[in-house]
Regions:
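N-terminal accessory targeting/assembly segments
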Residues: 1-108
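Short, ordered loop/turn segments at secondary-structure junctions
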Residues: 43-44, 141, 164
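N-terminal start-of-domain structural block
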Residues: 61-85, 123, 137-154, 160
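P-loop NTP-binding catalytic core
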Residues: 90-154
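Short amphipathic C-terminal alpha-helix that caps PH/PH-like domains
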Residues: 130, 174-175
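Glycine-rich phosphate-binding P-loop
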Residues: 153-174
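Post-Walker A helix-loop "phosphate-sensing" segment adjacent to the P-loop in P-loop NTPases
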Residues: 176-182
Length: 182
């Protein structure tokens, strides 16, 4: 994915973050943004990112740091709660089923993994409480990944699935590549 596309993607998801985290991420250099694949918020721990496959941290001033050190921004419970509410569009109930699976799919192909305490009633998980961390995986574009399949479906292809299993769901990016075939 190009740096411009990654910047656009990051701008789209920026609204989910608490104001402080949003500001720190906005300070990242473009090259780091283009190579970023995850953003991790863990209550009481440094804000961390995966950039070029490496775990890095953000300082209080928005600088990338490759080692644990003083001056790193520590994610607060408020950061977690603000981000979680925004990810759920301020209606946790509307995302009850997704939360039981441990993640929220986002509209742009990203997904947010949620770590929390499970709420169990009569032996069944009915929800979550006390969110302690959020891991946002940024969508990745794989150009031409569906080309090897084209020889099998040259006469046409009907793709069907249950309701809610379309392009906005996990695996959906592969469907987009199939749809772009000439």
């Amino acid at each position: 994915m190009t740096e411009d596309k990654k910047n656009q993607l990051l701008n789209e998801i920026a609204g989910y973050f608490s104001p402080t985290v949003r500001h720190l991420i906005s300070l990242l250099p473009g090259k780091a943004v283009g190579e970023m694949s995850e953003i991790r918020l863990r209550a009481g721990q440094p804000l961390s990112l995966t950039v070029k496959g490496e775990n890095v941290f953000l300082s209080d001033g928005g600088q990338l740091c490759y080692l644990l050190q003083s001056g790193l921004y520590t994610v607060t419970k408020k950061d977690i709660n603000d981000t979680f509410r925004a990810l759920c569009e301020f209606s946790e109930y509307a995302y009850k089923d997704q939360l039981k699976m441990g993640y929220i799919p986002l509209k742009n192909g990203c997904r947010a993994g949620i770590a929390a305490r499970a709420v169990i009633e009569n032996g069944k998980m009915v929800g979550i409480a006390e969110v302690s961390s959020i891991n946002i995986r940024l969508a990745v574009e794989y150009i031409n990944c569906a080309i090897p399949l084209s020889k099998y479906f040259s006469g046409g292809l009907l793709i069907a699935g249950p309701p809610g299993s379309g392009p906005g769901q996990p695996g959906g990016p592969h469907l987009h590549h199939v749809l772009r075939w000439p």
